[in-house]
Structure formats: C-alpha cells, structure tokens
C-alpha cells in the first residue's frame, strides 16, 4: 500500500503497527527525554460538569482540533456552544474566525498571551519586532 493512501491528504507520517496513529512528541519521561511515539489526540468538551462531546483525532496540535470538536458538538446538539472556553493551545486566527462566524464568544487566549503580558525579559528585548520604537507617522526610529 502506498504511503499517501495510508496517510491521506492531511498527514505526513504513520506508524507501521497502527496506520491510523500519527507520530507525536510525548512529554519527557523520568530520564528527561522526549519521545516521538504513535499517538492520538483525545479531546473532551465539558458543559456544566458533564462530558458533552468527545473525539479522537490524528492532529498533533490542539489548535487543529477545535473546529472539528465544535462541529461534532453542533452535530449532536443542533447548536454551537455560546461560550467555548479553551487554553492558549487552541487560540488561532482560524479558531477565532470560526467562533465569530458561528455566534460564539471568544474565550481562548492567543498562544503568546502569557509571554506578552507578564514576561519582562520579552518586553525589554530591543531586538524583538514588537519592541521596535516608531515615530508619530509609524516609521521605525
């Protein structure tokens, strides 16, 4: 069987023992080593302390799992949740746009939120583009 038939259009790897699994970087083990292992991304949506929706996905990033999970929620209940709350791992322009298009409030921080709001070293670094000084016309000084 050809690799593209096994992987499909959205993946670039597969495990020989489980063709549906995608290689993902796992957390460090007790020796402090990262591991690249075949795995799945499990997503669970909770409403009022009850599991409302769950899904198993092949995407490595949580960011890519948000829209399919919300679509599954909509398929099950006939509406989108009004206030989907998620951590910064889900924050992306596409996810914010999806929320806006479907009448959902955006309760997801963007990926650099903590660093941009609390990290003094980040704000004091003169070589970061966000810290470049501009004049009144917006030109770099």
List each model region and its residues.
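Anion-binding and metal-coordination hotspots
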Residues: 1-141
């Amino acid at each position: 069987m050809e690799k593209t038939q096994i992987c499909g259009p959205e993946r670039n790897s597969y495990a020989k023992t489980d063709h549906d699994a995608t290689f993902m970087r796992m957390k460090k083990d007790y020796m402090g080593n990262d591991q690249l292992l075949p795995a799945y991304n499990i997503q669970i949506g909770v409403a009022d302390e009850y599991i409302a929706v769950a899904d198993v996905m092949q995407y490595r990033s949580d960011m890519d799992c948000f829209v399919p999970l919300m679509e599954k929620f909509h398929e099950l209940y006939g509406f989108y949740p009004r206030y989907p709350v998620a951590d910064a791992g889900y924050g992306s322009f596409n996810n914010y746009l999806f929320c806006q298009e479907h009448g959902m409030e955006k309760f997801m921080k963007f990926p650099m939120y903590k660093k941009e709001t609390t990290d003094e070293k980040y704000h004091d670094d003169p070589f970061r583009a966000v810290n470049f000084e501009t004049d009144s016309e917006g030109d770099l000084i």
